[in-house]
């Protein structure tokens, strides 16, 4: 008999000296009439022991702290051996919570346990967005989180409705996922499983063989993220009119149309020599460099005390640098930089194939373009979650919770643990091609480029640039969508900028439009780490380095669980 599954949620107090759950709710996924809302954590945990089901909380990092704190205070201890009256967790080194598995004992050989998962890992959006995107017949409401609610507080009708809506939105969304066969712990795992189902596991293992951990570690040194760069010319200055374009599904579009690696790599010494059987390669290279006049810098060196990890470099400084580069990245560097004292050390070369992901992407593109609501959103999720799984870090050493003397949770690093890599070369080349796409477009607009962010280019002026004029479309895979046109803007640093975007009013809402159609502007604030509450305080006058405001909730572990304490956010 399949295990029952429930969507769950806690509402908690906001005081450091009185941290507790004042309301809980659970609803069975696939049977929405089976739900309960109550006001006692003890009562909820009693149900957890009896139900032996799979539970989903949206943001387990928060709610899970209350559960683990309760378990520790009630005689349960952490163990990964499945012993009675113990619990196991999957919490990453970075503090991401994936699972809590509570073992109550055994009936014969059958383990009596309840497993708690994070629905945020399967649906990585706020509840409000899920309700809207999935076109569910519910809306996430609002309550006063800071109201006084003493122990035994009687839940008001408004609070009851709020909690019920929250658990029902997630229950409905997960039910749709499960009925589509998306039953893994994360969206990325669902996506990888979907790809294997199309290719077949046997063929997958042949095309993408398991590499040794030492080889994976070396190849991983060529793995880099998106290209995010602000042109110094426009830094901290108010700019006039401009445009933003972004690539439709940047990473899937590279997977669809670019030559990508497969099979076991061949190690080579020295400089790569042309090999038609193995045309893709990663080159380990030591060199000095100087940016050419009129070119965008593309070299970023992380985990090096001599360089800022987020800075794109104009020169190599006093010493040569050593980098692992795909042939895609190396080609860009050779175009953008003068290279000196070059030493080609060694590398890996790969077979190539275009279209490995064609069937998978075609399948989900069809769903995305022909369906609405939930199925469309699931298609987008499947679409965007696959590339990252290939480069999953095999080091899965996690954190282990324990109870500190003050009754709060602490975390220590667990024993070293590794899993097999998936196929890191694929992630390395997909991201390299993505950077190539963005950088080559930006470089062709050198006299206009303000800013790049992974899949987007921000330009001065209101003319569509020549390099993309024939590939502008709001939906086509790999084409550039015209995101917006702004009247004025100010950029301070990567992922920190404001814009007055041309807009018009339609049915009481401001819709972005061309300058010719505009009747007003829409103020947009993009700032990593800044909450919506603080964004409401931002203006063109006060938006600068040093801007500071309260309104950023900071989680603090205390006796009982977690309290979100108001803290100060500063643009540095």
From Swiss-Prot:
Which terms does the UniProt entry file under GO BP?
DNA replication; viral DNA genome replication
Which stretches of sequence are listed as region 3'-5' exonuclease and strand displacement activities?
1-222
Give residue numbers for the site Probably involved in nucleotide binding selection: 251, 380, 387
Give the catalytic activity.
DNA(n) + a 2'-deoxyribonucleoside 5'-triphosphate = DNA(n+1) + diphosphate
Extract the ranges annotated as region (Interaction with the primer terminal protein): 56-66
The protein's assembly and partners: Interacts with the primer terminal protein; this interaction allows the initiation of TP-primed DNA replication at both viral DNA ends. Interacts with DNA.
Q: What is known of its domains?
A: The N-terminus contains the 3'-5' exonuclease activity and strand displacement ability. The C-terminus contains the protein-primed initiation, DNA polymerization and pyrophosphorolytic activities.
The protein depicted here goes by the name DNA polymerase
């Amino acid at each position: 008999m399949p295990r029952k599954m429930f969507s769950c949620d806690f509402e908690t107090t906001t005081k450091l000296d009185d941290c507790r759950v004042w309301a809980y709710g659970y609803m069975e996924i696939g049977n929405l009439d089976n739900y309960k809302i109550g006001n006692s954590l003890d009562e909820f945990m009693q149900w957890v022991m009896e139900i032996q089901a799979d539970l989903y909380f949206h943001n387990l990092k928060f709610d899970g702290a209350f559960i683990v704190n309760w378990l520790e205070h009630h005689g349960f201890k952490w163990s990964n051996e499945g012993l009675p009256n113990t619990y196991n967790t999957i919490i990453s080194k970075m503090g991401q919570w994936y699972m809590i598995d509570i073992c109550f004992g055994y009936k014969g050989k059958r383990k009596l346990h309840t497993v708690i998962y994070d629905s945020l890992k399967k649906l990585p959006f706020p509840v409000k967005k899920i309700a809207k995107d999935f076109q569910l017949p519910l809306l996430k409401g609002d309550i006063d989180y800071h109201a006084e609610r003493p122990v035994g507080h009687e839940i008001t009708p408004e609070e009851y409705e709020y909690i019920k809506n929250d658990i029902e939105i997630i229950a409905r969304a997960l039910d749709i996922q499960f009925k589509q066969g998306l039953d893994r712990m994360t969206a990325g795992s669902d996506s990888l499983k979907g790809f294997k189902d199309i290719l077949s596991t046997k063929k997958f293992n042949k095309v993408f063989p398991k590499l040794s951990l030492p080889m994976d570690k070396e190849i991983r040194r060529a793995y880099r993220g998106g290209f995010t760069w602000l042109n110094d010319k426009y830094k901290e200055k108010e700019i006039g009119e401009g445009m933003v374009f972004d690539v439709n599904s940047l990473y899937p579009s590279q997977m669809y149309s670019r030559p990508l690696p497969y099979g076991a790599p061949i190690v080579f010494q020295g400089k790569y020599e042309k090999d038609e059987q193995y045309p893709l390669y990663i080159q380990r290279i030591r060199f000095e460099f100087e940016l050419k006049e009129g070119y965008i810098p593309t070299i970023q060196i992380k985990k090096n005390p001599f360089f800022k990890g987020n800075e794109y470099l104009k020169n190599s400084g006093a010493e040569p640098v050593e980098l692992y580069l795909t042939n895609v990245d190396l080609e860009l560097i050779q175009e953008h930089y003068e290279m000196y004292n070059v030493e080609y050390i060694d590398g890996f070369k790969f077979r190539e194939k275009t279209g490995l992901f064609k069937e998978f992407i075609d399948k989900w593109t069809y769903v995305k373009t022909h369906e609405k609501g939930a199925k469309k959103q699931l298609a987008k999720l499947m679409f965007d979650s696959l590339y990252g799984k290939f480069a999953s870090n095999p080091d899965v050493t996690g954190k282990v919770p324990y109870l500190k003397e003050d009754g709060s949770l602490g975390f220590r690093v667990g024993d070293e643990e590794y899993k097999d890599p998936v196929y890191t070369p694929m992630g390395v080349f997909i991201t390299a091609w993505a950077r190539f796409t963005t950088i080559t477009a930006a470089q062709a607009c050198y006299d206009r480029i303000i800013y790049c962010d992974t899949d987007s280019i921000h330009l001065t002026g209101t003319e569509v640039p020549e390099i993309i004029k024939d590939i502008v479309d709001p939906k086509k895979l790999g084409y550039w969508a015209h995101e917006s046109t702004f009247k004025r803007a100010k950029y301070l640093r990567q992922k920190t900028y404001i814009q007055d975007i041309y807009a018009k009013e339609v049915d009481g809402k401001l819709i972005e439009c061309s300058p010719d159609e505009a009747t007003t502007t829409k103020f947009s604030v993009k700032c990593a780490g800044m909450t919506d509450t603080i964004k409401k305080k931002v203006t063109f006058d006060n938006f600068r380095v040093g801007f500071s405001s309260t309104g950023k909730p900071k989680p603090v572990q205390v006796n009982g669980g977690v309290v979100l304490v108001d803290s100060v956010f500063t643009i540095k």
